[in-house]
Structure formats: structure tokens, C-alpha cells
């Protein structure tokens, strides 16, 4: 289809005059009886089986529906409320399971021996065997989501509070659903309201993030930290005394509203003695130093960050966000204008010689929600990957670090989410280039210059990928050959030819060299090793006889696998970036923009033109993202088991330096738990391991065969049906080339992820 550049916008009325339109679109339930009502062709109903696939492909592609950018913006905004409603329902279900079916109280009373469980299998056909003995007279399925540890950090001490949260979350879901209906049908914002970016930043940064963080700091200060102090004292065997009564068990704990009483709170933290407002406004802030701390390191009782440090963090971050949210010019005529910043930002004339700098970028971002989404997905995806590292290096929740399946699960989860978001960023960047990019607006600005330099960028990136791939894989092949020939001295290893990661070791040692003391905001702060994280040459954090986190030594094996990471990341980037930079045109297909975001081929000429669409680059990028992150999570799993948790006898340094070592000592040796799981409570992971392998193998049927093969087969099957007068009214059609690839990629990823899920869980739950 032909995509026209967006029309130049007309001079708009001041945004604050009337930002919403009342009763814009009346509620029409009759549409629910018409699948595909947004499209003239789909609304006619199915003539072939292709209809159902097009229905799924286009249901959320609001750009292609009847309507303009304002209508699209309203639909997206309304969908946000629907999304929040689904999240609240999901949270309510978690709270309800915790309240009704879990051993939360039992786990709270003995978190180092009792394992978390929140689901009990009913004995219908004998599957009650799945209910493992988790300790504390509870039999159920062990959970690895980390919610018990998180609830303990929040200050939840009984199931009644969880039930209240479950009901509250359902009420919030109802409010969110109503919000989605209200802001689409009753009070729909105008396009100018959506384009008022400075006000949006003010609302999001100062309001949602800043005030939200300060509000959460308030909860941490008044509920979370006092509860943590009392619970930690119980777990340490040194109960605190409130009003002359020792708080020796959960049953003795004050109720949350009682902790807000200064008379009780001050017995835990004297700074909460009731003069907090006076101390705040007289700047006597040192009075708060008992519940707003800067201790660093981990709480030795729980193996997690100090709750008082977390309170301090959220307060400080919230204040910064409130200030940052007011940097932009809204109704008062002061502050920054994003358009002025971008239009005036030219950059260094030698390094960045684009004559028009960032002119036109503001208009692109203010009119293309795909461009906005691309940027936001790239940033939040990267943030998710950063979070995956923080969760083990600086465990935020009590007793999280000694729950190994949960630590591995959280790392893996945040890695997958980050990877999917980053690929999604490339997808929406490609859509933005095709649907929203107007070449006339971008003449010799940074975006235009990057597009003009795309051949240099892609060819150099291709060289980097080849260099990294051949060299890093070559190190492994060399080691396999040397080990096969019995020549260990000629291997790249810590005991042979060393390839030490000197830069990474230097970063780890920075924290040691900074040890001593310094003055921070007038207070003397000790900078001991492990102040930031124990992984940086700190000390071993042990809780209940289990290692939570410890210094992580880096050597030749890490140097080698990190260069495999570099290789897979660069190849993923190469594919995704090529899909964006060549989304509109290429030497092979100069008019690519006219073909749209997804198309299978551009005809049989030129020696073949398939898999060149921006969508196909996302398709290929997903496989490399999966490939790269599989290596990352395998590396993390083995490294932690070997060098931190002490489960595999420290074999990572010598075994992971060969391909054979990865196959034999990681995949094969560690799959013994899942392969021998039958007859045990973890047997569902054995079934899942098999089933997910099947789903993965099923994907190959879609990926390895072309559409024509299946259409030929269908013709024969339809002929047979016609002979028997059983011809269907809706004509069967083979999946289109693009649809087949989408189904194949989905099953490949889901099968692979679920296989890994079963492998990891069975391994660490099976080891106990």
C-alpha cells in the first residue's frame, strides 16, 4: 500500500482552552457482534481462513483503522487503562492466592527452612504428588516469583492483609476499566492535549514518578522499615520490646495502623517521635538519620538491602524527580521548551557536521507515537536488563538471595523482557520510518545524516560482528582441539595461556581502593569493600547456612563468554538497525516505503527480493535476541552455581572454556534433575520439558517449509472433501508467508523459553 507523508499541521488553538471533547464517541455495543468492524474488508466476514489471521494481525494496528491520529491517540490512551485493569486483576489473583492457599505465615516464621508455596493441587487423577513438603506442615507447589520476599519487604505480616490487598486491587481494576471507557466515550482528550509534551513530562516525571516515589518512601518509613526492624529482631533471636512487651513472634506484631502511632514507632526509630514536621521545617534533618540511613551493604540477618537505605533512596529519588519534572515550560512561560532545545542543538561541527542539527526532530517525535514508543522501549528494555543484574548483586527483598530458583528466575525473566522490548523498539522505529517519516522535514539534520551514512554504519557493524564471531568462537574451538589432543598447557585458561579480563577486574577493584572513610553531606561515612555490592570484592553474605551473594571472581572463562555476548549482541543490533535504516529504501528496492512495514517479497526479479521488509528484520532479530540471551542466562546460571552458591564445585573456570564443556558439564550434567523428575513433586517440569521441546520442534514446520507446499496440499484435501460433498463454506487457505513466519517465530520462542524454564526450575528445586 502507498503511504503518504503526514499533512503539515494547521495552526492549533491554545491547548488549555478546551483540552477534551465531551461525548465524543457514544458507546455502541452492536459493534461487539461484528468482528473486524474497524475495517471495511474484514467487516464483510470470512470468505477464506485468511480472514481470522488478518483479524488478529490488524486488531491493534490502530493506524490502519478508520480515523486519524487523534482517534488513534484516544484508543491508545484508553487501552492504557485497560492494561492497568488487567495488571490489577493479575495482582489481585496473586494476593488472593497468598491469602487463601499459601504458607505465607509459616514462611515468615522460618524463612530459612520453609519454602514459599501458594498453590495446592487438588487430588483429581492422582496429581497431588506435585504437592511437595515445603516445611512447616505445608504441602504445595513451590513458587519462585519472589512475592513472599517482596511482601515481607512491604511489611505484610498476615494473610488478612493480603486478602484486603486482593479486594483493593479488584476495586482498582474496576476504576481503571471505568477510566478507559470514560476517557474514550465521555471525555476524550484532543490531539493537542496529547501533543503537549512539556505538560506530559511534568505530569509523568514530577507527578507519577516523583510523588509516587515519595509516597512509597512514606510507606517504607512508616510501615516497611519498622516492620522489618521488628521481624529482623525476631529472626535474629533478639526481639525488640514495645510498651514493655517483647515482640517475639508474628502474633505479637503491632498492626500497620498502630505503627503510625508516634508513641509506638518511636520505640523502634526515635526519629519518629512525633516532631517530624517540626524537624523537617527547621531543617533538623539529622533527627531522621535512624530511619533514613546510608549504611550500604546487606543486612546480615536477611541478606538484603537495609530497609532504611531503601526508604532513603525512594525519598531522595522522589525529590529529584519532582524537581526534574518542573524543568519544562508549561503554563507559566518559564523553563525549557523541547522544541527550542532540539532546534538549537547542532552538535560539534567536526564530529557531528549535520548543518541543521536536530531541526525537525521535535516535529517527528510530537507526531509519531511509533517513534516515541521506539525510544521508550529501547530505554525500558535496557533498564530491565540492568535490573536483572541488580536483583542478585544488590538483593532488595529479605531472604531473596538464598532462594536460588527465585534469583535465577528473576534474572532470566528480566533478561527476556529486556530483549523483547529492545526488539520491539526496532519494530516501532521501522514503522515510524515508513508511516511517519517525511523526508522534506529532515534535510541535513542528524536523522537524515545517519540515513545517508547507513552503508558505512552497517558495513562496519558487519565487520565487527565477523571479527567478534570468528575470534571468540575460535578461542573455544582452539581449546576443544587442545583438550582433545591432551595439551592443557596450550589452552586458553587460568592455568594455561591466560586471557584475564583486566578492565573488568579493575572496575571490581575500584571499590577496594576506595576503602576508608569520607564525609558525605556532613556525615562520616565508612567506605568498606562491598558498600555498593558484595560482588565487587566484598565479603560473603551468608544467611541460614546458605550463601546469598559473594565476591564474583572473573577469569579467562568469563573473558571468553563475554566476547560471545558481545558477538550475539552486535549481530542482533546489526539485524535490527539494518531493518530501521533500510525501512524506506535500499539499493535492491528503492521504493520500499510504498510496500509498507510487512511484505513477503517484491517479486521474483533481481535474483530474489524476499525477507527485506522491516517486519522481516524484526523476525530475524527475535531469533538472535533469543540466541544471545540464552547464552547470557546459561552463563549466569552456571557461574552462580559454580562460583557463588557452591553447587558444582567451582567447575566453571575449567569446564566452560570448551564447547564440549558447555554440552557435557552444563546442559547434560545439569539436566539430570529434569530428566529424572518422574515420581517426584518436580515431575511437572519433566512433562513441561518434553512438551516445550515439542512446541519448539513444531515451529520448524512453519519455518522450514514455504507457503506453496501447504497450498498444494490443501488443494488435494479440498478436492477430497468436494468428492464427498463436505466442502466448507469458508475456503481453507494456507498461511501467508508472513503469517507462517510469525507463527513459527512465536512457537520457536515460546517452546525455547518454556524448555529453559523447566530446565532451570527442576535443577535448582530438585537440588533443594
Curated annotation (Swiss-Prot):
PsaA and PsaB bind P700, the primary electron donor of photosystem I (PSI), as well as the electron acceptors A0, A1 and FX. PSI is a plastocyanin/cytochrome c6-ferredoxin oxidoreductase, converting photonic excitation into a charge separation, which transfers an electron from the donor P700 chlorophyll pair to the spectroscopically characterized acceptors A0, A1, FX, FA and FB in turn. Oxidized P700 is reduced on the lumenal side of the thylakoid membrane by plastocyanin or cytochrome c6. Belongs to the PsaA/PsaB family. It catalyses: reduced [plastocyanin] + hnu + oxidized [2Fe-2S]-[ferredoxin] = oxidized [plastocyanin] + reduced [2Fe-2S]-[ferredoxin]. Phylloquinone binds at residue 710. The gene is psaA. The chain crosses the membrane at residues 76-99, 162-185, 201-225, 310-328, 369-392, 408-434, 456-478, 559-577, 617-638, 682-704, 742-762. It is found in: Cellular thylakoid membrane. The PsaA/B heterodimer binds the P700 divinyl chlorophyll special pair and subsequent electron acceptors. PSI consists of a core antenna complex that captures photons, and an electron transfer chain that converts photonic excitation into a charge separation. The cyanobacterial PSI reaction center is composed of one copy each of PsaA,B,C,D,E,F,I,J,K,L,M and X, and forms trimeric complexes. PSI electron transfer chain: 5 divinyl chlorophyll a, 1 divinyl chlorophyll a', 2 phylloquinones and 3 4Fe-4S clusters. PSI core antenna: 90 divinyl chlorophyll a, 22 carotenoids, 3 phospholipids and 1 galactolipid. P700 is a divinyl chlorophyll a/divinyl chlorophyll a' dimer, A0 is one or more divinyl chlorophyll a, A1 is one or both phylloquinones and FX is a shared 4Fe-4S iron-sulfur center. Its main location: membrane. NCBIfam families: psaA. It is a multi-pass membrane protein. This is Photosystem I P700 chlorophyll a apoprotein A1. HAMAP family: PSI_PsaA. Divinyl chlorophyll a binds at residues 701, 709. GO terms for biological process: photosynthesis. Divinylchlorophyll a' binds at residue 693. Its EC number is 1.97.1.12. [4Fe-4S] cluster binds at residues 601, 610. Keywords: 4Fe-4S, Chlorophyll, Chromophore, Electron transport, Iron, Iron-sulfur, Magnesium, Membrane, Metal-binding, Oxidoreductase, Photosynthesis, Photosystem I, Thylakoid, Transmembrane, Transmembrane helix, Transport. Pfam families: PsaA_PsaB. GO terms for cellular component: photosystem I; plasma membrane-derived thylakoid membrane. One of its GO terms (molecular function) is electron transfer activity.
Amino acid at each position: 500500500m502507498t503511504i503518504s507523508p503526514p499533512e503539515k499541521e494547521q495552526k492549533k488553538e491554545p491547548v488549555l482552552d478546551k483540552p477534551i471533547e465531551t461525548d465524543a464517541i457514544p458507546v455502541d455495543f452492536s459493534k461487539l457482534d461484528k468482528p473486524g468492524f474497524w475495517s471495511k474488508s474484514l467487516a464483510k466476514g470470512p470468505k477464506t481462513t485468511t480472514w481470522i489471521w488478518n483479524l488478529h494481525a490488524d486488531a491493534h494496528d490502530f493506524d490502519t483503522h478508520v480515523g486519524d491520529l487523534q482517534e488513534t491517540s484516544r484508543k491508545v490512551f484508553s487501552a492504557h487503562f485497560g492494561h492497568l485493569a488487567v495488571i490489577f486483576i493479575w495482582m489481585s489473583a496473586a494476593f488472593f492466592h497468598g491469602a487463601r492457599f499459601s504458607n505465607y505465615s509459616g514462611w515468615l516464621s522460618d524463612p530459612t527452612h520453609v519454602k514459599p508455596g501458594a498453590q495446592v493441587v487438588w487430588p483429581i487423577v492422582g496429581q497431588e504428588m506435585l504437592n511437595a513438603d515445603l516445611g512447616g506442615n505445608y504441602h504445595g507447589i513451590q513458587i519462585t516469583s519472589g512475592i513472599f520476599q517482596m511482601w515481607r519487604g512491604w511489611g505484610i505480616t498476615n494473610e488478612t492483609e493480603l486478602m484486603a490487598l486482593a479486594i483493593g486491587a479488584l476495586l482498582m481494576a474496576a476504576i481503571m476499566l471505568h477510566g478507559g471507557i470514560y476517557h474514550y466515550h465521555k471525555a476524550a482528550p484532543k490531539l493537542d492535549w496529547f501533543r503537549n509534551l512539556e505538560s506530559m513530562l511534568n505530569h509523568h516525571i514530577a507527578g507519577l514518578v516523583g510523588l509516587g516515589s515519595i509516597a512509597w518512601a512514606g510507606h517504607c518509613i512508616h510501615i516497611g522499615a519498622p516492620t522489618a526492624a521488628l521481624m529482623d529482631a525476631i529472626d535474629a533471636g533478639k526481639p525488640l520490646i514495645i510498651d514493655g512487651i517483647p515482640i517475639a513472634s508474628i502474633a505479637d506484631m503491632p498492626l500497620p495502623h498502630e505503627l503510625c502511632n508516634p508513641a509506638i514507632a518511636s520505640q523502634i526509630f526515635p526519629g519518629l517521635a512525633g516532631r517530624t514536621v517540626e524537624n523537617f521545617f527547621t531543617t533538623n534533618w539529622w533527627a531522621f538519620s535512624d530511619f533514613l540511613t546510608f549504611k550500604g551493604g546487606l543486612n546480615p540477618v536477611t541478606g538484603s538491602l537495609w530497609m532504611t537505605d531503601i526508604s532513603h533512596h525512594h525519598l531522595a529519588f522522589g525529590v529529584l524527580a519532582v524537581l526534574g519534572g518542573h524543568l519544562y515550560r508549561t503554563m507559566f512561560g518559564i523553563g525549557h521548551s523541547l522544541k527550542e532545545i532540539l532546534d538549537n542543538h547542532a552538535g560539534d561541527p567536526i564530529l557531528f557536521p549535520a548543518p541543521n542539527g536536530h531541526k525537525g526532530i521535535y516535529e517527528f517525535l510530537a507526531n509519531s507515537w511509533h517513534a516515541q514508543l521506539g525510544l521508550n522501549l529501547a530505554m525500558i528494555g535496557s533498564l530491565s536488563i540492568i535490573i536483572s543484574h541488580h536483583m542478585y548483586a544488590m538483593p532488595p527483598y529479605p531472604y531473596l538471595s538464598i532462594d536460588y530458583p527465585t534469583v535465577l528466575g528473576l534474572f532470566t525473566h528480566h533478561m527476556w523482557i529486556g530483549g523483547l522490548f529492545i526488539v520491539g523498539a526496532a519494530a516501532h522505529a521501522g514503522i515510524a520510518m515508513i508511516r511517519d517519516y517525511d523526508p522534506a522535514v529532515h534535510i541535513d539534520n542528524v536523522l537524515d545524516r545517519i540515513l545517508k551514512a547507513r552503508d558505512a554504519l552497517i558495513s562496519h557493524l558487519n565487520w565487527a560482528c565477523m571479527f567478534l564471531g570468528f575470534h571468540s568462537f575460535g578461542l573455544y574451538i582452539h581449546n576443544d582441539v587442545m583438550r582433545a589432543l591432551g595439551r592443557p598447557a596450550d589452552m586458553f585458561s587460568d592455568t594455561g595461556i591466560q586471557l584475564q579480563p583486566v578492565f573488568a577486574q579493575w572496575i571490581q577493584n575500584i571499590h577496594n581502593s576506595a576503602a576508608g572513610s569520607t564525609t558525605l553531606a556532613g556525615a562520616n561515612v565508612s567506605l568498606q569493600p562491598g558498600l555498593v555490592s558484595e560482588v565487587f570484592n566484598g565479603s560473603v553474605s551468608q544467611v541460614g547456612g546458605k550463601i546469598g551473594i559473594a565476591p564474583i571472581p572473573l577469569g579467562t572463562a568469563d573473558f571468553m563468554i563475554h566476547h560471545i555476548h558481545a558477538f550475539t549482541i552486535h549481530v542482533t543490533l546489526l539485524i535490527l538497525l539494518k531493518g530501521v535504516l533500510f525501512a524506506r529504501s535500499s539499493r535492491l528496492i528503492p521504493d520500499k516505503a510504498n510496500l509498507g512495514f510487512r511484505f513477503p517479497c517484491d517479486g521474483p526479479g533481481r535474483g530474489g527480493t524476499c525477507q527485506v521488509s522491516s517486519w522481516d528484520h524484526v523476525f530475524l532479530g527475535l531469533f538472535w535476541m533469543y540466541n544471545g540471551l540464552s547464552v547470557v542466562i546459561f552463563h549466569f546460571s552456571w557461574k552462580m552455581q559454580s562460583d557463588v552458591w557452591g553447587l558444582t564445585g567451582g567447575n566453571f573456570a575449567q569446564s566452560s572454556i570448551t564447547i564440549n564443556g558447555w554440552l557435557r558439564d552444563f546442559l547434560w550434567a545439569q539436566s539430570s534433575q529434569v530428566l529424572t523428575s518422574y515420581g517426584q513433586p518436580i515431575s511437572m517440569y519433566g512433562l513441561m520439558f518434553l512438551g516445550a521441546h515439542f512446541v519448539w520442534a513444531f515451529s520448524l514446520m512453519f519455518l522450514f517449509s514455504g507457503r506453496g507446499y501447504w497450498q498444494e496440499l490443501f488443494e488435494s484435501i479440498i478436492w477430497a472433501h468436494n468428492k464427498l460433498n463436505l466442502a466448507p463454506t469458508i475456503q481453507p487457505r494456507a498461511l501467508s508467508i508472513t503469517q507462517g513466519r510469525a507463527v513459527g517465530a512465536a512457537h520457536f520462542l515460546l517452546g525455547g523459553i518454556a524448555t529453559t524454564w523447566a530446565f532451570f526450575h527442576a535443577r535448582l528445586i530438585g537440588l533443594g
